C-alpha cells in the first residue's frame, strides 16, 4: 500500500530551473484518415469529458477531453464500419461510418441510462465480500497473456490558472498476465515526446513529476497487487454499497470506501465500480486522505528548496478499464495534485495544479520485450527526457487526447514567449 502512496502519486520535485539534455525519437508517417467530433448529453446538451471512443473490431481508441472533443487517426487499410461511444451513467452510442468521407466535426449525442436499481440484486449488502470476490476473479476477468499497450501521456503544471509547463509523449507499456500482480515485471518505454516551459522569471520555481509515465504501471490498481486491491489492504477500510450505475450498457455495483485505521502513511477514500455479471473492476475514483497533512506531504513531495513551504490541497485519481472479447483491459488513468507553495519570508502563497493523464490507444500481444536499459525508470523525470519541439504535425499518425481550447491557447502563448 505504501508503494501506491508514494510512487504512484507521482512524486513532485520543486526546484529552481536548471538546464537539461533532452532525448526523443521520430517515426515515419503513413497514409491515414482522421475522425474528429464532440460528444454531448442529449438531454441538456452538456459536453461530456472522458468518454471512451473506440473502433469495434480493433484495439484503437481514445477519450474525449474536458471540452468533449476527440480525434482518431486510422490507417487507410483498416476496414471500419463505425465508432462505439461509452461513458459511465449513459447508454452506449454507435456511429455508422460506411465510407471514409465526412468524418470531421461529428456531433455525437448520448442518452443517460435509466435508473435500474430495482433490477439489480444487491450483493447481500456485504460490500467487502463483493470486493473480495472481484479480487479473486482478477486472473479470470483480465488478460491471461502479456500485452504491449500504446498510450498517449500528458502532464501539465498550472500556477494559479496559468499553464507554466506542458509535456506530452507516446509511450509503450508492456504488461505481463494479470495473474501476475507484481508491477516490477511491467515496463514503460518512451516513443516520442515534447515539452514547453514558461520562460518568465516569476516562474523560476519549477514543478516536475517523478516517474510520471510509470503511473500506467503503479496506478493500474487491478494489476498492482501492492495497491488498494489486496486482501491485506482491505483491512484498512470500511466499505459501503451505493446506488448502481450503467457503464458499457452493463450494470455496475458501486462500492465506496474510507479509512478505518490510522497508519504511518496516508490512505485513500473513493469508489470502486464492479461489473454486475462478471465481478470485474471497471473503474476506480479515489483520493488521498488529507486529514494528516504531514503524511500527505510525505506521500507527494520528493524534493524542494530550503525555505519553501509546501501545503497539499488535493490528490485525486481516476482509473478505468474496458472489456473487449471477454477480457478487461486498462483504458485510462488520470492523476491531479493541487497544492500551495510559499517562502517563509513572503506574505502570499502561490497555488499549483499538476495534472497527468494517460489513455491506451492501441494494444497487441505479439511484440518484442522492452529492454531494461530503455525502460523508463521509477525515479526519472519525464520532462527532462523530451525536447522543446511544438510543430502542428508533430504526432503524425499517433492518436492522442485532443488538447482543450484553454490548453491550446496556453501553448500558443508559451511558444511566443519562448521565441
Predicted feature locations:
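Short Pro-Gly-centered beta-turn/loop motif in secreted/extracellular proteins
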Residues: 45, 72-80
